[in-house]
């Protein structure tokens, strides 16, 4: 089968002309941009105006959410912490062969639990670790000193000129994940909150 992602408009038209099926999906993009101070509002205090245009911590991000969403995220994170789960974050060449092996065990198990073979092979990840190690950030969940789950994101540097920012931007893409143990809310922590926190810090 053939799958094309992020194809140019002319390529999409060519594919359609050749009888390929087109599938439209929705994507969610998050940017580390703190809310702009309200204009014409008493809320536009000196604190608002002094805020950086980026979140500087996960708490800053939480403060930008509604009370209900903030409460839900805090509860989910607390459930994971109360279960005794901590995280290690590894990037680039700091990810050892053993770490990659553990990640793949988790990744493979998740696919097998859903009755599918994994799309990507261990050799694929070996090649990626060898040829572009700087492009990966691995989050390993541990309990009692033993790894129990992991998630992986790809990153790339984007020149400032392409984003309109002053500095080079780091862009994180998607995630792969898997777990050897079930812990309530672990998926959210490993796949969303840990990567989001990493993005804010970097």
For each predicted feature, which ranges?
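Conserved acetyl-CoA-binding loop-helix of GNAT-fold acetyltransferases
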Residues: 183-197
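Hydrophobic pocket-lining residues that define ligand/cofactor binding sites across diverse proteins
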Residues: 1, 199
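A conserved beta-strand-loop-helix scaffold within acyl/acetyltransferase catalytic domains
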Residues: 2-185
